[in-house]
Amino acid sequence: MATVSMRDMLQAGVHFGHQTRYWNPKMKPFIFGARNKVHIINLEKTVPMFNEALAELTKISSRKGKILFVGTKRAASEAVKEAANNCDQFFVNHRWLGGMLTNWKTVRQSIKRLKDLEIQSQDGTFDKLTKKEALMRTRELNKLENSLGGIKDMGGLPDALFVVDADHEHIAIKEANNLGIPVFSIVDTNSDPDGVDFIIPGNDDAIRAVKLYLGAVATAVREGRSQDLAVQAEESFVEAE
């Protein structure tokens, strides 16, 4: 079972919050104290909360649930893409377009356009166009790939969101709340935990911390998927008898 220890968290700097003057009072229950005007997060709270979140994510993926990783700030962007790809899930790592979940119908049309352009770029269609037209389509393709590439094969709304920074991704969280999609999120001392179903109090800026969370989540999701495959194999074996 995917778990993260106190030692792992200390080494990654999960306990370092933001400067005390930027705090959100709603995070008070998760703060241990302050050192040099920086809030220290209580890892005695974080460790069990994160491990509970991991267990739930394993459960969701064992039921073929789709997990959408969200982290659009530069520090997290590459790690988010990597983690999602590692467990065959989906991601948004550049910009959250308003309505990405709540206006899925429109997003689906944009994904169709992206896939059409991908085919055109590979089947020689671009070569038959004028230089200017080909350039415009290439730009459109790159722009769509940037914003929708991580969800183009999702095929519908996700079953859960894993968010790296609750403050930065508040629009994504609000959309998930409106649709009843559970939200798992890293919540730093400057963030509002409201709207997050599984709160993970922790540093959301240090790349080592971000990679620790994402690596553990990817492992939890993979475990869930292998449980699902094991059940499928068992069922087909029983049918074959």
From Swiss-Prot:
Species the sequence originates in: Yersinia pestis
MF term (GO), any: structural constituent of ribosome
Protein name as annotated: Small ribosomal subunit protein uS2
NCBIfam families referenced in this protein's UniProt entry, alphabetically: rpsB_bact (TIGR01011)
InterPro entries in the cross-refs: Ribosomal_uS2 (IPR001865), Ribosomal_uS2_bac/mit/plastid (IPR005706), Ribosomal_uS2_CS (IPR018130), Ribosomal_uS2_flav_dom_sf (IPR023591)
One cellular component term from this protein's GO annotations in UniProt: cytosolic small ribosomal subunit
Keyword entries, A-Z: Ribonucleoprotein, Ribosomal protein
Protein origin, superkingdom: Bacteria
Pfam families, alphabetized: Ribosomal_S2 (PF00318)
Protein family according to the UniProt entry: Belongs to the universal ribosomal protein uS2 family.
GO biological process: translation
